[in-house]
Amino acid sequence: MAPYETSINIAATTDKVWSAIEDVERWPRWTASMTSVERLDRGPLARGSRARVKQPKLPPVVWTVTDLEPRRSFTWTARNPGITSVADHQLSPGPGNTVNVRLSVRQTGLLAPLLSLLASGLTRRYVNMEAEGLKRYCEADAVASPASSSEAHRAPA
């Protein structure tokens, strides 16, 4: 399957956006692309952390964090027979006092071409839903409690 990527600018602090992204069990509260996310370990999200993700129209999948740079990015990977899925979540400074969030997903393996035929539209739709839901969630909270400093809105350089 060809990689799919989307990005969105969010008018909220980096801390707010990162907090929403790293709290994976709460994703179903702000994106309809997730039915449930269950952490399979305790503690802060870190390399090696695992979560069982249930999404509409898809079987449950266990994702493992393979890379994490706090307040900047995390990548997680799901390995199943014939297919490996990799999803990236990256934060960077956006225009004005916004945070740019880039979400991407790619699949490799013997079954990737078949999955592309069957589910590429669904994958794109879910990634877009995640981006839009994250924006709504973070900006609604930002309006309720604006940051005290415009610098707080910026992703680290």
Which ranges hold each PLM region?
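A short, structured loop/turn motif at beta-sheet edges
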Residues: 14-15, 42, 66-71, 90-100
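Short, surface-exposed coil-to-beta transition loops
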Residues: 3-5, 59-63, 83-88
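Generic structural detector for well-ordered beta-strands
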Residues: 7-11, 38, 52-54, 64, ...
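Short beta-strand segments that buttress and anchor functional surface loops
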Residues: 49-56, 74-80
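Hydrophobic ligand-binding cavity/cleft-lining segments
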Residues: 1-42, 147, 154-157
